[in-house]
């Protein structure tokens, strides 16, 4: 009986379009007729419902474990060829969808941004979702990666991505609110802020738009709307190159997505 089934599975395998399966997130394993499914996990965000369904599918169709990828993704290995359609259907019930592989736009990575992190200057996850809606799965000559990080701490290593987006604070001093305490000068790590005759002086050539001055100010004497620093052409595969930031500070989402396009 077991031998007969494996024979049927081999016949099925001969008719499979592996390129299409890979495009849909199912990667062939070294074990015959086994696949590892890469899920689309935007910005590393999964709900309890997602996690429950992933666990159920891994137990039912895999070998009971999942792999967390280097780009915040989840892979379910040891899925049999015959179960692929059922796996997709059951994952969809839990709000999960397959990712993509090959030469196309991959899942967007992101930190938690200013919704959770005290250092965050932007809502990283919101930007990641919008990027995913615009570009996910788009066919390109080579795999393409977006990364969104909320501030200069750069937890997501923005410059490692083909397009990296880093949250910034477009800081402006508000003299009327300032008490001349000098806290912002001490908070500034780049030496962009100095106190001169009890007043703040900012050298914007030194400013990296981290926003520490605004966050440290006890009297809210800084205006610090969200902004973006974008980098291009970062690669960290077989060849390594740091993404470059040729554009000035981007001050709104419309400009940001125009730059991404």
PLM feature spans:
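Small-residue-enriched alpha-helical segments and adjacent helix-cap loops
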Residues: 9-13, 37-171, 175-179, 187
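Short beta-strand elements
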Residues: 25-28, 163-167, 228-237
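Short, flexible, solvent-exposed loop/turn segments with mixed acidic/basic and small polar residues
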Residues: 26-31, 62-68, 236-237
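Beta-rich nucleic-acid/ligand-interaction surfaces
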Residues: 152-154, 204-208
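Iron-sulfur cluster-binding cysteine motifs and their immediate structural context
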Residues: 183-201, 208, 212-228
